[in-house]
Every structure is written in structure tokens, then in C-alpha cells.
Amino acid sequence: MSVVNSIRAQIPPIHREGYPFIGAFALATLVLFLIWAPLGWIGTVLTIWCLLFFRDPVRVTPVREGLVVAPADGRVSMVVQIIPPPALGLGDKPLPRVSIFMSVFNCHVNRSPVAGRVERIIYSPGKFINAELDKASEDNERNSLVISTPAGQIGVVQIAGLVARRIVAFVREGQPLAAGERFGLIRFGSRLDVYLPEGAKPLVSEGQTAIAGETVLADFSLGDGGRTYRAD
């Protein structure tokens, strides 16, 4: 393998949603250099940050019935038992919920936590308060998916935050999803909530770092078979 190919192998691909932003940052940087060189270097740093924000690295997802993987990169901010939002249609009993907070430095491509079929997609307009606050799950703008699996229904909620003002979903109702498959993106900092079926036990704790498509949040499989893995 050549040196160039070795370098390319270490650079993650960029998601297409980022192209307009990266182009705008690069153009602004060029203008800033023409105005005053120090401003141009500031623009260069911001352009590099924009590239990193929209990175879309390959992830190796454990594939086995009953596994629930993280839908987002970030920090596990909450692991609680709570009644899910009525819009999800998951009942009125408390369910395990794992919340992952994404900072502006995390990769923001969202991945399906399970293999299943998208039953419902519910968009809810709202505010843009700090996504780390518990009330953000009901007050903020959000996009919710309900995914049907053999083990029950999983709720996945993309929540906008103080900086995030745009939720993007790539899927439609009735569409099948593989575990770890890309389903959306939130621009510039936000939160993902995962509502697990009743009785499921989360395997992560608050403060833990999660990697989308790889970190196992829960395992409600009845079998003891070994895991296999799929790269995407």
C-alpha cells in the first residue's frame, strides 16, 4: 500500500449533508484571507472543525438478535425508568431510557440501535433549550422513530439542542433497518433518547462514552449465542 493510500485509509469519509457547510466555510475562509491573514487562519480552523463534525467513519456493529447498540456518539447522560412520550405509542408504563448527549465535537451521524422495521415517524416542533436537561425530551424540537423488532418496539428520539437547529432523517415509515444502519443526523450538538422494551436492563451507566453502532446499550436476547459483526 502506498503512503497516499495509507493516509487516505486513516481519514474518515464525510457525510454528504456536510458538503454545503464545508463549501461555505471554505469560501468564507478564502475571503477572510484576502481581508486579513489572521482572520483566514481562524476560518481555516473552523473549516477543519466542520470537516470533523460531518465525518462518517465506518463502524463495526455486533449483529445478534436482542442486542441494542448506541444510535449516536457521545456521553451517556441519563439512564432512567420513565413513561415514554404519548406520541410514541409505547404505553403509559415506565420504560428504560438511555440518553446520549452529543457535543459539537462528536460525529453526528445517527445509526439504528436495532434491526427492525420503522413503524412510525413523528416530528414534534418545539424549543431549543439545553438538550442535557430532562425536560428537553418533551419541550424541544424532536423527531421520533418507533422500530418494531421480534423482541418488541424500540423508541428512538432525535432531540435538538441549544446549537442544533436542524434534524435530518433519511428513512421512511415501513422501511427495514439493519442494526447500525444510518438513519439520520442532527446538526451541531444534540441528544438521542432510546426507549427500551419493558424488562430490558441497560448495560451502560451515566458518564460512559458511547460509540454509534458499536457500544451495546442492552441485551434482551433469550439465547446465549456468540456475536457476529458487520462493518458499515
Curated annotation (Swiss-Prot):
It is found in: Cell membrane. Pfam families: PS_Dcarbxylase. It catalyses: a 1,2-diacyl-sn-glycero-3-phospho-L-serine + H(+) = a 1,2-diacyl-sn-glycero-3-phosphoethanolamine + CO2. InterPro entries: PS_Dcarbxylase (IPR003817), PSD-A (IPR033175). Is synthesized initially as an inactive proenzyme. Formation of the active enzyme involves a self-maturation process in which the active site pyruvoyl group is generated from an internal serine residue via an autocatalytic post-translational modification. Two non-identical subunits are generated from the proenzyme in this reaction, and the pyruvate is formed at the N-terminus of the alpha chain, which is derived from the carboxyl end of the proenzyme. Pathway: Phospholipid metabolism; phosphatidylethanolamine biosynthesis; phosphatidylethanolamine from CDP-diacylglycerol: step 2/2. Its main location: membrane. One of its GO terms (molecular function) is phosphatidylserine decarboxylase activity. Binds 1 pyruvoyl group covalently per subunit. Keywords: Cell membrane, Decarboxylase, Lipid biosynthesis, Lipid metabolism, Lyase, Membrane, Phospholipid biosynthesis, Phospholipid metabolism, Pyruvate, Zymogen. GO terms for biological process: phosphatidylethanolamine biosynthetic process. Its EC number is 4.1.1.65. One of its GO terms (cellular component) is plasma membrane. The active site is at 190 (schiff-base intermediate with substrate). The modification Pyruvic acid (Ser) is found at residue 190. The record marks 189-190 as: Cleavage (non-hydrolytic). Disulfide bonds: none annotated. Its cofactor is pyruvate. It is a peripheral membrane protein. Catalyzes the formation of phosphatidylethanolamine (PtdEtn) from phosphatidylserine (PtdSer). Belongs to the phosphatidylserine decarboxylase family. PSD-A subfamily. Heterodimer of a large membrane-associated beta subunit and a small pyruvoyl-containing alpha subunit. This is Phosphatidylserine decarboxylase proenzyme.
